Amino acid sequence: MTQQRTLKNTIRATGVGLHSGDKVYMTLRPAPVDHGVVFRRVDLEPIVEVPADAELVTETTLCTGLSCNGAKIQTVEHLMSALAGLGVDNVIVELSSAELPIMDGSSGPFVFLLQSAGIVEQSKPKRFIRIKQTVEVRDGDKVARFEPYEGYKLGFTIEFNHPMIPAKQSRQEIDFSTSAYVTEISRARTFGFMRDLEYMRERNLGLGGSMDNAIVLDEFRVLNEDGLRYTNEFVRHKILDAIGDLYLAGGAILGAYEGFKSGHALNNKLVRALLADQAAWEWVSFPEGTEQPPVTYASPVYA
């Protein structure tokens, strides 16, 4: 039996937006069963709620952003990834700005916040999206694909012409029946190249970026004094992003995901293509007395 989960307590954090550079106050609150993840812009009058829904994605340039009722919520993918990795279904995310705080560029601080708040099971079974048929989307040589699989696994391949990202460190697979999100994925940070800085600044992107919240590379090396957290941290972060982007489908995935040079835009296109093909997926749950789901989550943390 796998139940829905929410937070036991409310918890708050402060940070800066990666792209806006704005200071942002964030509050995570418990939510009732079947509520889902809902963002709330408390700086607006009246307050505007924006559900975590793939159909509301309007921004995929260097982040995943949502728009609803005139309100924007930017850079949701790292928190969404942490929620997916810890199996949290229902939460209210209050924000004082249009962008989530970037924290250290990974999902690790969000995992810490969620565990500090306490994670509790609720009265109704968790709902999974089971992949029944292969769904694939492409953009040039980029590919993102769902396939049926009894569990949840992700494979990702990146290609960067850079000495710090050799081919042998450009491929990663993770299966959540045997691997732990917290240790294997959550600490992988976002990354960027000095050569792209001018492009980003011209578009008012990356204004809050620094070596405190991203891996920065020049033409030859990593510039961060502390180096990398994993030898293949770059591709692990791409998996972290994908987990967050896919959680916008509205439920935990039971299936296999494969990405080749994919990013936020193609991940969102894949989720939309899946949801539009009703023969390709189904809702499933595992009530008491039935089989266990073929994916494991950490035990609830009762703070």
UniProtKB/Swiss-Prot annotation:
Signal peptide as annotated in the record: none
InterPro entries named in the record: Ribosomal_Su5_D2-typ_SF, UDP-acyl_GlcNac_deAcase, UDP-acyl_GlcNac_deAcase_C, UDP-acyl_N-AcGlcN_deAcase_N
A Pfam family per the record: LpxC
Residues at which Zn(2+) binds: 78, 237, 241
Active site location: 264 (proton donor)
GO BP terms, alphabetized: lipid A biosynthetic process
Pathway this chain belongs to: Glycolipid biosynthesis; lipid IV(A) biosynthesis; lipid IV(A) from (3R)-3-hydroxytetradecanoyl-[acyl-carrier-protein] and UDP-N-acetyl-alpha-D-glucosamine: step 2/6
EC code: 3.5.1.108
Required cofactor(s): Zn(2+)
Highest taxon of source: Bacteria
Keywords: Hydrolase, Lipid A biosynthesis, Lipid biosynthesis, Lipid metabolism, Metal-binding, Zinc
Family per record: Belongs to the LpxC family.
Protein's recorded name: UDP-3-O-acyl-N-acetylglucosamine deacetylase
Gene from which the chain derives: lpxC
